[in-house]
């Protein structure tokens, strides 16, 4: 398994985002907050749609794609003030909304070699037609049709390989 340092890439969205910025790995614009008032001010400045994420692991339910400012404010208050996700929600990452389809790209890495597994796309939303809140997972299909060979190669070159290189440079493969 991963080292404790590397496990933070999955266990803390704030850590992962900071890691990506530090190592010039493409990611959406973001800010991290533990204060609800500051987070709400940021949402008001950025506008909606916007994505609110509990920093820690929240059983697949810690991400709210807020289509309105009020929905974003409610999510911030639930996470930071309402303690909805316990310690996982003691910080939030507020991220730029990116239009498009999401796919999962999982690799096995031994510190140097990359073995890509089959890609997949989740059925995350509770309602028909990809509507409603995210769930912990309603199912998935694989391989993900949006991951063409060109997309696959681009993800390896611009995301996966730079992560491996950065972990090795940090002495934490």
What do the predicted segments below correspond to?
Residues 8-14, 127-129:
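Short, charged, surface-exposed secondary-structure boundary motifs
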Residues 1-11, 25-32:
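A short, GP-enriched loop/loop-strand-helix hinge that lies immediately N-terminal to
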Residues 31-35, 66:
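Short acidic-hydrophobic, aromatic-tinged amphipathic segments that line or gate anion-handling sites
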Residues 47-69:
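Conserved anion/nucleotide-ligand pocket segment
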Residues 66-173:
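Internal nucleotide-binding/catalytic subdomain
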Residues 4-6, 16, 38-39, 71, ...:
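Catalytic-core regions of core metabolic enzymes
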